Amino acid sequence: GTTGQRCTSTRRVIVHESIFERVADAMVDAYGKLRAGHPFEQGVHYGPLVYESVCDDYQAAVQRAVDEGGRLLCGGGRLPELGPCYVAPAIVAATADMPCTQEELFGPLVYLIPYKGSIEDAIALQNGVRQGLASAIFTEDLREVETFVSAVGSDCGIANVNLGTAGAEIGAAFGGEKESGFGRELGPEGWKTYMRRQTVTVNYSGKVAMPQGVQFKL
């Protein structure tokens, strides 16, 4: 993987309170099986962070989450035996009102956030940040799917269903909303970003054409 350094990496996992602990246990178990090392080695799941300063930022972010009331479920430290830029991915049980969950971090830190109520409540939590690049929902409920991808659903440029936020390399239009930018790469919208579009109307009739067929008798 990209060790959380991809722009579409998952930062928040919003889970209904009724299954929160079950999901937390499953995630911690999965994280415990991840193997760090050289990305070209067989069986390695993730490599180092790009700079030592990024490692410092990562550890500071984990500590900030704990200071704000988060519960560190796993990870968060360095792995010096592998090199200066290796860290253990962290999961923090958090709440949506913690300021740290509003910030973007390029590192392997995931906030696990519970919600009460309906899918609309979960979407409100998801949309309640300044960033808006990628989002995803995992559900077998068609109504939840339709709500998530509708005008009242995810406000991100990318909305995936039963697929992670990193999505799939399918050549579709790629881009975000809010502080995550504007415009699109790839797909039919991609080349339009590099153009200056102009609407041109040429009238060869010899008569003046007015909008909506309006005529003035002078």
Locate the predicted segments by residue.
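Conserved C-terminal structural/oligomerization subdomain of aldehyde/semialdehyde dehydrogenase
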Residues: 35, 67, 79, 86-218
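ALDH superfamily catalytic-core signature
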Residues: 1-96, 120, 124, 161, ...
